[in-house]
Amino acid sequence: YPLLLGAAGGRDADAHPLAARIERVVLFGRPTLTRTVNALLARPDVATALHAPEPAPWFEPGRRRETPVETLEELAAFAGQGEPGWLAAWQHASMRAQAAVEDALVTTDAGDRLSPQTVAHVSAAMVRGPLVLGSSSVIRDVDLTWRPPSAPDAEVYANRGLAGIDGTVSTAAGVALARGRRTVALLGDLTALHEAGGLLVGPTETEPDLDLVVVNDDGGAIFASLEHGAVAEAPGMAEPVERLFGTPHGVDLAALAAAYGVPHTRVTDRVDLVRALSDPVRGRRLLEVRCDRADRPRVAAALAAAVRATFPPTCPVPD
């Protein structure tokens, strides 16, 4: 849906024709992940409501424009009756967009390395139990590429505090222990390094069944897609932006995993990743996938272009 909405939440040339017809939006949870969704919520021609059966600690009346609704009856009254064919049109657009994304991911992987978006798509698609998502770029990659799982008991967890990076390794271990099921954690390298101490399991503690899939692009990728990326293009600014925002680290993740007694595997292609995540092993593993930060904007642009190419000349929007 973020790709269907376009950059301006449905009010730009990149948006699917359906997006401009949106009249009401119901918000579930805090919308901090996607700028396109925030742009949609800010559209003056769109009425918005927040479904809040219990008080939301982040929502202060008067500071956001959504109207709080508590009951399903209030929600139904706000939503009203959709036009015939409206839901089917969105479902059709979504299926076409999903197919376009998956086809584009296959064609955009660069030789002997996977793109970060492909790692996110494959890892999430393999979920048969709990999935823990790291913050920053990783969770946004899943947001763009994930096909909802067929497993009815799939669960997704994420730390969404100030930045969400704190304690993610320990969160994943806690989820695995609490749920009693093999858990997959998809993390960026900085998220993994920020709490490397979470890999420590004392001799009297229970080891979780946990796969840590680490997208290692040697630094922080999120800033290149924000305003900082434009700053880097100015004369003399590329090096300081890379040092202060890219923060390359050069850490040997295999050596780090060995120090904590965690088996390490380097994954180089899609087949290896699928095979590794299908292997019913016990205990913990660190699956390292080395990526290039330069691939991220290239692949993101290719995904957006692929979805735009699926827009029919005339969209089947109900009159």
Q: What kind of region is each of these model predictions?
A:
Residues Q91-R179:
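Active-site diphosphate/adenylate-binding microenvironment
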Residues T48-A88:
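Terminal amphipathic helices with adjacent charged low-complexity linkers/tails
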Residues D141, W146-D319:
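Thiamine diphosphate
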Residues Y1-E60, P148-R181, L193-L200, F245, ...:
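Glycine-rich, anion-gripping cofactor-binding loops and their flanking helix/strand elements
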